Amino acid sequence: MEETFQLLYDTYHQDLYQFLFYMVKDKNQTEDLLQEVYIRVLNSYHTFEGRSSEKTWLLSIARHVAIDWFRKQQTIRQRILGTFDWDTQDVRDQQLLPDELAVQHENVREIYAALDQCTIDQRAVIILRFIQGYSIQETAKALRFSESKVKTTQHRGLKVLRKHMELLREELMDDEVRMERRTDKGVVKSTSGS
């Protein structure tokens, strides 16, 4: 079993890491979730029947681990919202984006923000299809969806992404117009003052 596990690790670790990282967008959390994936693999490898590829099986486990984590986060968030007195406390988000997400290209940041607007299934399909380059058939096998569900989920996810990207671009254009107006006013003041 040790040799088999090592082979699985060597062969698929990077794919699993990328999949989970794009889901949770945090290096430390990704590593924690990977540990959970590997524990589940060790505990259930004897039940693997080979009806799908090992990669498909591993990605399915990773997806379930991510879903469990998101559910747990939602429960924690609801508990906090229910017990915290928001009217009397100064609340600020102290959490910064991980270094891995401080990507230079603005479009990549916009896509990350837009992915947060998608459901877990939409996010998983988009990550597998467009970031990891899976075909519709491979995505269906990995997520244990029908091909039509992959297509529908992909279509809906892309629609959410497109809408969110348009909103972000509108905000950026509004900001640029405001900056131009301020700059124009500053130029007028400095030239009229001489």
UniProtKB/Swiss-Prot annotation:
Disrupted gene: phenotype observed: No effect on antibiotic resistance; double sigM-sigX mutants have 130-fold increases sensitivity to the beta-lactam antibiotic cefuroxime. Association with RNAP core increases during many stresses (at protein level).
Main localization category: membrane
The organism's place on the tree of life at top rank: Bacteria
Localization per record: Cell membrane
S-S bridge residues: none
Cellular component per GO, a single term: plasma membrane
Gene Ontology molecular-function annotations: DNA binding; sigma factor activity
Protein's UniProt keywords contain Secreted: no
Record-stated family: Belongs to the sigma-70 factor family. ECF subfamily.
Protein name (Swiss-Prot/TrEMBL): ECF RNA polymerase sigma factor SigX
Organism: Bacillus subtilis (strain 168)
